C-alpha cells in the first residue's frame, strides 16, 4: 500500500527558524535560541565543533545558514553544530510532531552532515532519531534511522535504519527537505515530503525531542581528500504539531 505524501496542512508550525539571522551562543551562557555544542559536550567525527566567532563556523546570508568546516594551518579541522537545547535542558523541544530541515549538502569524500533529534530526558537511556545522515563518499544515497542507547546504563542498545538511493549528485546540487513525523504509534520519514520509511514508535520515544544540525567529518572514512573548506547550507528548520483531527479538514 503506497503511503500518501505528507499533508502539511494537517499540522501547525510550532518552531520556525528561517536563518534570516542566527541567535547562537557557545553553551547557552546567555539566553540564545541555539548553542554550538551537544548539551552533553560530546564531540564526534574528525572535526572539532567550535564556539561561534564572527564569520566562522556559522554565517547567514539572505536566509541561508552556512556551516563551514575548515582545516586550520596546524592540520586541525574545525566545524559547526547547532542544538536547540542547552546543558540545563532549556530551549525548544517537543513531544511528537513533524521535524523538517531544508538543506543542500556539501560534496566531497569525508563530509558527514546530519540533521537529528535527541530525547530530552537522558537519565535512563538516550533516544536518537537521525532524520538525515549523509556520507560524501556515496553521493547517490543517504540514511535515516534511530537508536536507543542503553549500554551506558547496563542495557542493550536498539537500532534501526534505512538507506535511500537518489540520483547521483542531486543532494549536493539542489535543496531538499528531510523530515520525520513522530506520532505515538508510528514514526515516519519523508524526503521532499514524500514518504520513505517508518517504524513502530517505541515507548522510549514518548518524550520531547529537540533538533540538532551539524557538519561533521569522517565517521571512519578518510578525510585526506575532503574539500577545504566544505559548507553545509541550511534554508530552514521547522517543527510542526499535528492539528486536532477536526481542525485538519
Locate the predicted segments by residue:
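GH16 jelly-roll
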Residues: 1-249
Amino acid at each position: 500500500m503506497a503511503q500518501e505524501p505528507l499533508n502539511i496542512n494537517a499540522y501547525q508550525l510550532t518552531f520556525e527558524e528561517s536563518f534570516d539571522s542566527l541567535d547562537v551562543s557557545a553553551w547557552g551562557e546567555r539566553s540564545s535560541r541555539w548553542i554550538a555544542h551537544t548539551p552533553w559536550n560530546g564531540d564526534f567525527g574528525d572535526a572539532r565543533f567550535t564556539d561561534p566567532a564572527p564569520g566562522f563556523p556559522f554565517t547567514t546570508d539572505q536566509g541561508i545558514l552556512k556551516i563551514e568546516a575548515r582545516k586550520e594551518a596546524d592540520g586541525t579541522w574545525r566545524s559547526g553544530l547547532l542544538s536547540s537545547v542547552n546543558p540545563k535542558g532549556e530551549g525548544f523541544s517537543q513531544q511528537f510532531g513533524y521535524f523538517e530541515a531544508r538543506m543542500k549538502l556539501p560534496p566531497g569524500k569525508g563530509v558527514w552532515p546530519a540533521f537529528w533529534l535527541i530525547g530530552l530526558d537522558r537519565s535512563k537511556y538516550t533516544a536518537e532519531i537521525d532524520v538525515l545522515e549523509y556520507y560524501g563518499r556515496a553521493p547517490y544515497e543517504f540514511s535515516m534511522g534511530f537508536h536507543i542507547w542503553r549500554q551506558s546504563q547496563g542495557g542493550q542498545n536498539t537500532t534501526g535504519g534505512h538507506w535511500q538511493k537518489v540520483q547521483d549528485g542531486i543532494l549536493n546540487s539542489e535543496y531538499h527537505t528531510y523530515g520525520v513525523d513522530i506520532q505515538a504509534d508510528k514514526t515516519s520519514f519523508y524526503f521532499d515530503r514524500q514518504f520513505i520509511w517508518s517504524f513502530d514508535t517505541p515507548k522510549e520515544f514518548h518524550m520531547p525531542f529537540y533538533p540538532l544540525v551539524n557538519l561533521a567529518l569522517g565517521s571512519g572514512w578518510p578525510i585526506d581528500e575532503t574539500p577545504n573548506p566544505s559548507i553545509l547550507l541550511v534554508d530552514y528548520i521547522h517543527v510542526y504539531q499535528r492539528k486536532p483531527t477536526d481542525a485538519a479538514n
